[in-house]
């Protein structure tokens, strides 16, 4: 067995209960999941929030891993201390160091199974290209959004998020569990292939690059004055063009997409995600792009997993 360790995180948000439930079943029956001969560490990201059945206690744990927050001694939120605990125990220089972190989430949006990467770290892009090639999952590349930062997986040399939906918060769902299992198996299989030099990389990677967040239209008191338009509700990953309706009020007033040229396509994701209401995000707008898989991506991942 390789000395490489992979950290699997569930329950980073305490009201996303499917992956934590799956981890508990795995603990009771270790043959449930094929580890592909990889050293695995599993952890509940925010156990207190999970016990309380809410997204977080004091602040979003998945926005609490900024370096300035981790280095600060003047913080008192429960999630600040939890972020420090996780990095101290499982970070690359921790007591039980892991090289890759995979953070399992669920979403109320119709995202299906998808992967999320933050920025353009070569090793991240290499591993998700393999998983996409195996399962065909869409990839959301989140970058250039200073208001949303400090994500858990960024504290590890390589890491990404698995999102599965739609499912209401706090609800166990058979299909969500199955999709999570399928994606987890693919993740571990592809990591094992890299470690054992059995990898065949695709020529290209398809990403949906983050452009901007879009809020609901609001009235003078800050209350949403329109609803997500019926033609895009539940249609994450479907392209739309300039002039397409995004929102509609009860009186029929439309808010249109006014972005780019007339024929340019954009792809909305995380449409009407319940957890993002507090962040004033009704959806995120992305641009679908096809990138050639680069040698430096492959080399970085190989060096990380075969030191």
Curated annotation (Swiss-Prot):
Keywords: Hydrolase, Metal-binding, Zinc. InterPro entries: AspA/AstE_fam, Aspartoacylase, AstE_AspA_cat, Aste_AspA_hybrid_dom. Zn(2+) binds at residues 13, 16, 105. It comes from the Bacteria. It is an enzyme of class 3 (hydrolase). NCBIfam families: PRK02259.1. This is Probable aspartoacylase.
């Amino acid at each position: 067995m390789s000395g490489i360790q992979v950290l699997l995180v569930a329950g980073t948000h305490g009201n996303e209960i499917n992956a934590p439930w799956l981890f508990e079943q795995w603990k009771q029956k270790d043959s449930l999941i094929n580890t592909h001969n990889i050293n695995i560490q599993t952890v509940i990201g925010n156990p207190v929030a999970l016990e309380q059945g809410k997204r977080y206690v004091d602040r979003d744990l998945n926005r609490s891993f900024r370096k300035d927050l981790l280095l600060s001694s003047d913080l008192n939120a429960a999630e600040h201390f939890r972020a420090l605990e996780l990095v101290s125990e499982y970070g690359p220089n921790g007591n039980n160091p892991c090289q890759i972190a995979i953070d399992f989430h669920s979403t109320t949006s119709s995202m299906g199974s998808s992967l999320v990467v933050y920025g353009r770290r070569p090793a991240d892009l290499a591993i998700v290209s393999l998983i996409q090639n195996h399962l065909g999952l869409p990839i959301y590349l989140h970058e250039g959004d200073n208001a949303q930062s400090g994500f858990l997986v960024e504290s590890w040399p390589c890491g990404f998020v698995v999102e599965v939906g739609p499912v209401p918060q706090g609800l166990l769902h058979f299909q969500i569990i199955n999709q999570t299992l399928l994606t987890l198996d693919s993740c571990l299989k592809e990591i094992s292939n890299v470690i054992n030099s059995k990898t065949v990389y695709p020529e290209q990677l398809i990403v949906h690059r983050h452009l901007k967040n879009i809020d609901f239209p609001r009235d003078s008191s800050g209350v949403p004055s329109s609803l997500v338009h019926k033609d895009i509700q539940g249609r994450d990953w479907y392209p739309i063009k300039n002039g397409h309706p995004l929102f509609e009020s009860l009186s029929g007033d439309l808010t249109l997409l006014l972005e780019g040229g007339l024929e340019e396509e954009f792809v909305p994701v995380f449409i009407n995600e319940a957890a993002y209401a507090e962040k004033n995000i009704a959806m995120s707008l992305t641009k679908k792009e096809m990138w050639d898989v680069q040698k430096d991506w492959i080399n970085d991942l190989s060096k990380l997993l075969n030191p």
